[in-house]
Each structure stands twice: as C-alpha cells, then as structure tokens.
Amino acid sequence: MSFAPLQNDTFLRACRRQATDYTPLWLMRQAGRYLPEYKATRAKAGSFMGLATNVEYATEVTLQPLERFPLDAAILFSDILTVPDAMGLGLSFAEGEGPRFAKAVRDEADVAALAVPDLDKLRYVFDAVTSIRRALNGRVPLIGFSGSPWTLACYMVEGKGSDDYRLVKTLMYSRPDLMHRILAVNADAVAAYLNAQIDAGAQAVMVFDSWGGVLADGCFQQFSLEYTRRVLAQLKRTGVDGQDVPRIVFTKGGGIWLDDMKDIDCEVLGLDWTAHLGKARAIVGGQVGGPGKALQGNIDPNVLFAPPEAVAAQVRAVLDSFGTPHTDKTTTGPTHIFNLGHGISQFTPPEHVAALVEAVHGYSRSLRQR
C-alpha cells in the first residue's frame, strides 16, 4: 500500500517533540454538525451510522473541515462505539437521544459472552481510513482513534450515555472481578482495532478516555490507566509507509493524574481546559534533548461562542501558558499541539473557528521569532 508523500508534517513533528515553525492544530470533532456541509452529507446518508459506515461519505466529511480551515491533521470520521457494536451489542442512534445499545453487559453471563470482535465486522472503518488517506493526497497526516477500555465499558454497562455512572460504578465496586474481565477484552479489542487502522494507513492513533475523569483516585489508576497501558503495549510502532506512528492519550479530567500518566508508553498526552499547560509541561514535557511527552490541548470549546477578537485573546493565553516554544532543530524538546479541551459544539459559528485557526498559526509563529 503506497500513498502520496506528506507535504505538511508539522503535526507529526510536534508529536515527536521536534521543533516546528508554528504550533500545529486540529480540533476534536472537527468534522461535525457545526459545518453546514456536514449536515448536507448527513442528510444524504440518512443517519449517523449511515454516514459512518459508508466509505465515500466518511471520506467526504473527514475532508470538509480541511477545505475550510488550514488545519494540520485530519481525524478519521467514525464513532468510539463501533467496537462494542462489533461485539454484538447492537448500537443505534435515536434522533436527539444519542447512542444506545440493544444489549447491556451487567452480569456473569453477559461478561462470559464478550470476546474481541471479528475485525471483518469493522472493515468499513479500515476501508474509510485507506480512502481518506488517499483523498488527502499527502496534504496533512491522518489520525485514527478508539475509545479507551474504560470509556467503552461505561457505555457497555450503562447501555447508553450516563449522568451519574451508577450502573458501571455499582459493577466496579461490587464485582471488580467482572469489571476487570470486561476491561481486559476491551483493551485487546481496542489494540487490534487500532493496529488495523495503522495497517490501513493511519499515521497517528489516539485513545479517547472521555470518562476516565469520573473515577475516584485509585480507581482511575486501576480501572482506566492500567487498561490504557495494556492497549499501548500492543500497538504497532510503524505505519504502512515505514514511519513511526505516534500514540496520543486523552483523559478528560485527567490533569490531576499527570504524575501517574507521565510514564505511560505514548508520545502525546491530551489535556482538557481544567489543566494548566505550563504546569503539565513541567511534569511530563521533559527537557531539551531528554525524554518527555508532547502535550495536546486545551482551550475551552465554549470560547468559540465569544466574538473573534475574544477567541484570539484566549488562544494567545493558551499558547502563553505552555511557555517558550522549543526551537532547536538539532534536538528534541517540549512541544505543544493546539486543540480544544473536548469536542467542538454543534452550535459553534464556523467563522469563529476560522479566527481560532488564524490566531493559533499567527501568534505561535510570532512567539518563535522573538
């Protein structure tokens, strides 16, 4: 499998803690409902899953934000719940209700029936990865992704999204043995799923631990982080083009556990808006010439509802909070990838996103020229 050479490798260089001319950026959920062209494609597809399972449509919507904004990476258009769906739990999206599963995993029998899914059931995802990588034609790198074992387990036990995580936490505290069995299957499934995305052409992969932050201290390390480690240990290190594949881990609410996360086997840690980038850099960013992790984040997505000049001011504050950019091209050092602290809201005005992108690129360039 061969693809066009990469023209803009700024994102990958920052993942590798190499100096870049500006701070690269992409946005979580950058292909989505805030774009009128996305809504038009989704209407053609008829449903969210109709969109995600159709290679042509998934390719089209992945590229839409790049046509509008000079972003530095594309991310596969899919959903974290494709993996439990392939396990036979029956995923559906009701209009205005969000995802739900026909079957939930709540007792011994349910857990015994769980297995790493036949990856052929997810062929549509891998075909989309290859199709998107071809369509990008080397413009920017393509990021593949999955939910974390813990975050998937939350949906699998609750049967849908939850406000209080009552069912999954009840299982975790009353039958930790069952919880560990679910998480072990999930970790092996996620690793196989991400490896198949790498084989299909993904140039970086990201684990979304969206619900890790709801766990108590101690439980986070045992039930979330431990299984994210199990995923990372199994991931392929080299992509189809012979290049290394950076691994990004994002735990929403995880900023309080940076001491625990600094040693996990990944290249990039994502942060939400509650974390301070400069403090995170001091804990995990490393020194020039030494080991460390790149940081990704972390502006509050709600900043995008403010007028463009306020957006630009908040962008500058985030870039300043990271501190002096790494500029020595001869060695590695602390680097930053600009992103939101969580997914972009469907109500975001696209012109405010344009202001954000312009501010990130412009101001981060000026910081390197001081």
From Swiss-Prot:
Task: List the subcellular locations.
Answer: Cytoplasm
Q: Which GO terms describe its molecular function?
A: uroporphyrinogen decarboxylase activity
Family annotation (InterPro entries):
UROD/MetE-like_sf, Uroporphyrinogen_deCO2ase_HemE, Uroporphyrinogen_deCOase
| UniProt key word ATP-binding | no
**Can you state the subunit structure given in the record?**
Homodimer.
| Known function | Catalyzes the decarboxylation of four acetate groups of uroporphyrinogen-III to yield coproporphyrinogen-III.
Tell me what this protein is called: Uroporphyrinogen decarboxylase
Organism this protein belongs to: Acidovorax sp. (strain JS42)
